């Protein structure tokens, strides 16, 4: 098991929130951070602390992408026209592993990344094994034949707590079309995300 995968629920505990909305998150039983001092009452958080927390939560939600990747995505968002926070969300939602997750081809973001890495995902009929690959509007993302019978894919498609968002249009159980780049209020986050604070963090 990778370090990132084993730590996924540690992020839930640290944030005190069920980041991915999973029924088996330990936060459903306790809302304090990990470790023996997790239950201590916290004082008022500084502006920097709030900004850092917002960045850690958003970065963690997308499969704990590396700081280098996240900063590069932010830099691209800041060069685009319009609101930088909205641009950042749009770029993150265009990641191939995220579209695979949204399509319910994988039960978790981490599993979606694994499926892509192992060559089970096709974009417009071409095998693509780069999780961070940018999906464009109109692209068709499909499962390879072997993936259709994988237990984790079948598990993902049966999860009642997750719905496929409007900007990912399904065609059967093994194919979706990315129809548009979503805005913040269209993304089905189980918790509140604050990209404006992420912008403030990187603008210091």
Swiss-Prot record:
**Cross-referenced Gene3D superfamilies, in alphabetical order?**
Ribosomal Protein S4 Delta 41, Chain A, domain 1, RNA-binding S4 domain
Keyword DNA repair listed? The answer is: no
Its assembly, as annotated, is: Part of the 30S ribosomal subunit. Contacts protein S5. The interaction surface between S4 and S5 is involved in control of translational fidelity.
Give GO terms for biological process: ribosomal small subunit biogenesis; translation
Which GO terms fall under molecular function for this chain's record? Answer: rRNA binding; structural constituent of ribosome
Task: Report which gene this protein is encoded by.
Answer: rpsD
Give UniProt keywords alphabetically.
Answer: Ribonucleoprotein, Ribosomal protein, RNA-binding, rRNA-binding
Write out the function statement from the record.
One of the primary rRNA binding proteins, it binds directly to 16S rRNA where it nucleates assembly of the body of the 30S subunit.
For this record, an example GO cellular component is: small ribosomal subunit
The organism named in the record is: Erythrobacter litoralis (strain HTCC2594)
Q: Which domain of life is it from?
A: Bacteria
Q: Which CDD domains match?
A: S4 (cd00165)
Q: What name does UniProt use for this protein?
A: Small ribosomal subunit protein uS4
S4 RNA-binding domain location is 94-154
Which parts of the sequence are annotated with region: Disordered?
1-49
Which protein family is named in the record?
Belongs to the universal ribosomal protein uS4 family.
């Amino acid at each position: 098991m990778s370090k990132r995968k084993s730590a996924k629920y540690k992020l839930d505990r640290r944030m005190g929130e069920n980041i991915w909305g999973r029924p088996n998150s330990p936060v459903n039983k306790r809302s304090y951070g990990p470790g023996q001092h997790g239950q201590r009452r916290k004082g008022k958080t500084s502006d920097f602390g709030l900004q850092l927390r917002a960045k850690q939560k958003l970065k963690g939600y997308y499969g704990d992408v590396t700081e280098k990747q996240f900063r590069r995505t932010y830099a691209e968002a800041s060069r685009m026209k319009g609101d930088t926070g909205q641009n950042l969300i749009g770029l993150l939602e265009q990641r191939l592993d995220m579209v695979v997750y949204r399509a319910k081809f994988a039960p978790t973001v981490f599993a979606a990344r694994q499926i892509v890495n192992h060559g089970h995902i096709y974009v417009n009929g071409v095998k693509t094994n780069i999780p961070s690959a940018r999906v464009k509007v109109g692209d068709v993302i499909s499962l390879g034949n072997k993936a259709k019978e994988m237990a984790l894919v079948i598990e993902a498609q049966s999860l009642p707590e997750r719905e496929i968002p409007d900007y990912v249009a399904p065609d059967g159980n093994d194919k979706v079309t990315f129809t548009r780049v979503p805005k913040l209020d269209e993304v089905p986050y189980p918790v509140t995300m604050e990209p404006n604070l992420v912008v403030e963090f990187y603008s210091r």
